[in-house]
Amino acid sequence: MYKFESGILLIAYNNSKIDYAKIAAFASLAAKKSMANNHVTLMTDTFTLDYMKMSMSPELIASSFDHIIVEQLDHETNTRTHHDSPWVEFTTQFSNKNKHTIFEKSPYRKTLMIDVDYFIGNNTLDIMFDTDVPLAMYKRAVSVANYDPRIWEQKLHPDGIDMWWSTVVYWNADSEEAKLFFGIWEHVKENYDYYKWLYKFPGSLYRTDYAASIAVHLLNGQIKSNFIDQLPGHVMRYSDQIDDIVQFKGINDVTFLCPDPDKPWETICSRIKNENVHIMNKAAIIRHHDRLLEVLK
């Protein structure tokens, strides 16, 4: 039934402004350096794969991805505003509306799905593959400058339910819990406007974090319970879109320039070592392309 016992799944769909496939290659190589369960599958579309073959060497593609799932897709419109420091922003297509299909498409019995901008710097997530946990995610996050996320990244509404991050999702495909979760996620996605009204969250962007959080809430019986496990450490580290990358001394040794969210002209440097980090500023990752290739060899 499964092609492989366990591994890591990445999803990359390029658009006109962000080379997600290249970022995915960096994330994959980082995982391979840090984790024992490091068989990596890339889920992508024909447009992105064609661009990969033009912009990346065959050696880089082969060393990054052990398996590639390619589909011909017409992505639903989903426009997102990105930031590159507090002073630069741009909008572009964000193709994420089929993320719930990872349950059906993963070639693994036990899957760790990570977003392409999640860089693994240690092996703490390896422990999940040795457990009977059916499904796990992060609910809490702290920035590399030790700020809490904005309120809409802690809750769907100030008086509403907790937000769970869909940045990292682990599941065992044999479990009924995982099957139910992804089925409800799909239902929420198909009825997103209704759930947006019901849970009173703002914005026009389809957020997988919100869809997954509603699925968790429904599975929990619409109360706080422990139906969904939390990933090791219980806290996801992230760098904000307004943060910049100063230096990669190594894939597990990164220095960030972090503006104060309320006073962005005031900044600090934060050095993160041997941690897994969700690096939201994708333009900053691409700027360090050459250095990343050096440290990931």
Task: Please give the residue ranges for each predicted region.
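Short Gly/Pro-enriched turn/cap motifs at secondary-structure boundaries
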Residues: 91-92, 157-160
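Active-site-proximal specificity loops/subdomain of glycosyltransferases
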Residues: 49-106
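Glycine-rich phosphate-binding "P-loop"
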Residues: 7-18, 79-86
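A glycosyltransferase accessory/donor-loop signature
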Residues: 1-12, 20-26, 42, 50, ...
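GT-A fold catalytic core of metal-dependent nucleotide-sugar glycosyltransferases
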Residues: 95-147
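Short, acidic, metal-binding catalytic loop of nucleotide-sugar glycosyltransferases
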Residues: 30-37
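Residues at the starts of beta-strands that form the adenosine-phosphate
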Residues: 39-40, 110
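Short, polar loop motifs at secondary-structure junctions
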Residues: 44-49, 73-75, 119-123, 231
